[in-house]
Amino acid sequence: MDFMTKLAEVVGGAMVRLRRSSAPRKQAIGASPDIPEARRQGIMTLKMPTAKGWVPGHKPKAADGLQVNAFASGLAHPRWIEVLANGDVLVAEALAEERPPRDLFDRAMVGTMKRAHAMGVSANRVSLWRDRDGDGVAEIRNDFLTGQNQPFGMAVVGDTFYVGNTDGIVAFPYQAGADRITGEGRRLVDFKPGGHWTRSLIVSADGRRIYAGVGSLSNIGDRGMQEEEGRASIWELDLESGAAREFATGLRNPVGLAWEPVTGRLWTVVNERDGLGDETPPDYLTSVQDGGFYGWPYCYWGQIVDDRVPQDSALVARAIRPDYALGGHTASLGLCWMPEGTLPGFGDGMVIGQHGSWNRSTLSGYKLIFVPFADGQPSGPARDILWGFLSEDEKWSYGRPVGVVIGPDGKSLLMADDVGNVIWRVSGA
């Protein structure tokens, strides 16, 4: 670590100690959260545990009535999961790539991210895992698709496999049960790469459209809104015509996407902006309206204006308030609908992988949670499913939750852990 990087980390650490004494004690979570007044940070808080990984015999802690085991291990930064119709499990292995720092704080952030194993050389592949004997542990692994550009979201429609690379959606010929993709891909839509680089995918119920989450380049449009065109949005791609459009906008970093079956509405989890305090604003879970605008970068949680940003009063007036707050800077990424009966003791609701904070005085996230639903809406407080990803002193991270899906048996969850390099399986005890 060079002197300037160390100096920046020391300053960031000092901000942690200074701000911890005035940090809110109550997390901004739920349908009606108590969001503290914004406190603009001249130097952003920088606090993140060093990546350690899991030692043999050590694993996350599970809620009462549940158990957890490693479905697959030895991966290279697993981020997203897709379960195929035959029970095979696809895992996107990708990582934020190192870039030249723009200023002193950026230099410190890059150093912190590398120490946390959140930045480096990306494997750029999709691997296939097969549990042939049904014991909850995969015995077979294949390189399903290689040579991609930070692959993330995946989907299969008929005889086509789709992957969301950071620079666009690519389609490949696919045969059910195949161990690997061998045909040439064709680009369907281009996205601006980098920044918030993940590109999640989900298919409509009728199989005619794909939706893609595309995050912003910057925190609050720092490099100008022209650079943000086509970003901070959810895109809709018509598979028959090839036409693509922005379905919803003003979503700073929409990652996980899921369908809620009662109303048929699309839901997403969104990572909100930095630099306004530990709980301000909270990340959130929300339904997504066609043509809806959700505030970024001008405002948050409805019409709460961010005065760091040149304003657009017409857009602020249109801003839709999210449905459910998930706490400040929890980095809620993974999302799947879990029907009642999947896990004992849990009803209908959304499961959310919280990757964990890096920019607040006290850590938040670093767990897998459940938000109960009734009549198509969140209906109560969140519950923890998995935790124990941090050392007791919070200096080390054993793992970090990311993508989550229903397991092939319909009675389990599979969750990607991109620090432990494991796919965890959660089932009834």
Predicted regions and their residues:
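Surface loop/turn motifs at the tips and blade-to-blade linkers of beta-strand repeat domains
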Residues: 70-75, 142-148, 188-193, 246-251, ...
